[in-house]
Amino acid sequence: MVLVGCHVSIAGSIDRAVGRALDAGCDTFQIFSRNPRGWKVKDLDPGLAGAFRAAVSASGIGPVVDHMPYLPNPASPDAEIYEKSVAALAGELRRCSLLGIPYLVTHLGHHRGAGMEAGQERVVAAINRAFEDAGESDVMLLLENTAGEKNSVGTTVDNLSRIVDGIDAKERVGICFDTCHAFAAGYDLRTAEGVDAVLGEIDDAIDLSRLRVVHLNDCKGDLGSGLDRHEHIGLGRIGEDGFRHILRHPAVRRLPLICETPVDERRSDTGNIAKVRELAGA
């Protein structure tokens, strides 16, 4: 049995996301807790937060995963963007606490030509400040690996390890592993040996106990292309055999699996969830 779900909309009211997750056949699901394309955010209404928590509890599905909005860039050398990014991260941690969401996934941003080391140092400082500003919390911040786009931070396991090492409250940080991003960054997930290799590297450098969520996406780009273009499960360059190897690895089978696959006529979210269960042998 695997826990698999997808990203669902909060349109209309955040508690409606739970019904959408149930309709899609989710065992677990991911949301943006607010508009992901803007900086401004309204305070979370306590009544709505309570309704969301009640709906999740009644549904029997979970854990719920929240994803940071698109604009924050905690690696940015631009002072204004950086400060807004720290504030956004602290604010989202507080929102997760109110909503009872245990995991917040964040991208690590782009260093804008300042260099990987400088970018990593900014990310570490941003996370340390955000944790302090947000206050004590059971919410775990999950660092997501990136696809290897120009100037991106967090592409390699070594990048992620160096960031984790610099964080003061290490018990509050984990990893979200995105299969599309890993493949685009050069990690070959098409074979059992390739899957074993990258998970072994994570275990050696970071510890598999920090791996808490998998973003399960096929990849439109070739191995090492740096192309962050998600594809339906089994229809991209990783392929069905690759996902069989991924899904049958014991370190993956125990985790919440979130599909962030395209919205088009070829396959629905429900179809991707069914395909994951098929390939997992569940």
Swiss-Prot record:
GO biological process assignments: base-excision repair
Cofactor(s), names only, from the UniProt record: Zn(2+)
CDD domains: AP2Ec
Binding residue positions for Zn(2+) 2: E144, D178, H215, E260
Keyword list, A-Z: DNA damage, DNA repair, Endonuclease, Hydrolase, Metal-binding, Nuclease, Zinc
Entries under InterPro entries matching the protein: AP_endonuc_2 (IPR001719), AP_endonuc_F2_Zn_BS (IPR018246), Xyl_isomerase-like_sf (IPR036237), Xyl_isomerase-like_TIM-brl (IPR013022)
Residues at which Zn(2+) 3 binds: H181, D228, H230
GO molecular function, one term: DNA-(apurinic or apyrimidinic site) endonuclease activity
Domain of life where this protein originates: Archaea
Broad EC category: hydrolase
Pfam families given in the database record: AP_endonuc_2
Enzymatic reactions: Endonucleolytic cleavage to 5'-phosphooligonucleotide end-products
Cofactor: binding details: Binds 3 Zn(2+) ions.
EC number: 3.1.21.2
Annotated binding of Zn(2+) 1, by residue: H67, H107, E144
Family: Belongs to the AP endonuclease 2 family.
Main function: Endonuclease IV plays a role in DNA repair. It cleaves phosphodiester bonds at apurinic or apyrimidinic (AP) sites, generating a 3'-hydroxyl group and a 5'-terminal sugar phosphate.
Alphabetized PANTHER family for the sequence: APURINIC-APYRIMIDINIC ENDONUCLEASE, ENDONUCLEASE IV ENDODEOXYRIBONUCLEASE IV
Descriptive protein name: Probable endonuclease 4
Species for this entry: Methanoculleus marisnigri (strain ATCC 35101 / DSM 1498 / JR1)
